[in-house]
Amino acid sequence: MSKMKFESALRYKEEAFIKFKKDFGHAYGSQTYHLLDFDRFCLAEYPHKDTLTEEMVMRWSVIKETETSNGYLSRITTLRQFGKYLVMMGEEAFILPDGLKGGTMPLMPYVFSPESLKSFFQYTDTMERYYQSTVRHLVAPVMFRYMYCCGLRPVEARHMNREDVNVQTGRVFIRESKYNKERVVYAPNELLSLTKRYLDQISAVFPESTAMFVDRKGQYFSKSTQQYLFEHCRDGAGIKTSGTRRPNMYSFRHSFATHRIYQWHKEGKDISTLLPSLSAYMGHSKYQHTLYYLHFLPEQFSEMSGFDFERFSEIIPEVYEE
């Protein structure tokens, strides 16, 4: 390790931080390697930047596909401590948010690109009537749009009643959610016009059913039926696995959160002050669960550069607990 040295514009601050840690009895072996890795990143990407900024921290803090949970957490913890040290010394620095727990780091989620999202809904919108189900081609375009536009869990979409959606105000009551935590969200206007037409069509076929999204018998979707329909649409749209990431029904929810945070970033808004609203909207039991998306987001920036988010500007309004 004696042959390794810090070379970026942050080198003097990094060396002082390592000395500070060792002076207090910390071996700081693997942590030094992490900081050296960050230093090489800064030398290549920010050769003249001597301030620890949010952009450089977030770009380096993306979990790698081959990285274990423990390895990832060790790496970002080192950078978080470096940021705290700089602030303690009176320096301006971005501190990586706390909240990640060992053993609970999920795999990198699949996030729909603009092209894949467009392909998926183009397929659902042009599905033909299936001989074994008179409504499948009607349900798919609406149910999966609710999962994306409102960030719903698959089970939340399955349990929706027709009376849960107010097509005049956009108010959507989410029942039987995870942790038995009911909540209210609001659907964007673009989705409401589609919903009105859908309800008219479904009511004509199954007038007695209370389910929002019905199977071929007019009953609530089962988990397996919903999964089968998603896979049928995904494969029909030609959406493939990306690296180790495979699109699943939760990808709509991951995409909703990631696209929303990206839009805030694009608009120059303070993401840290808006995350609690997103956390409540999505029904997260802990604010830390929402923080995960901050660590997955930088990798998606280049893929989403041409995405039009303006029509989803109403996706996250006030959240009401009931």
Predicted regions and their residues:
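Conserved catalytic core of the tyrosine transesterase superfamily
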Residues: 1-322
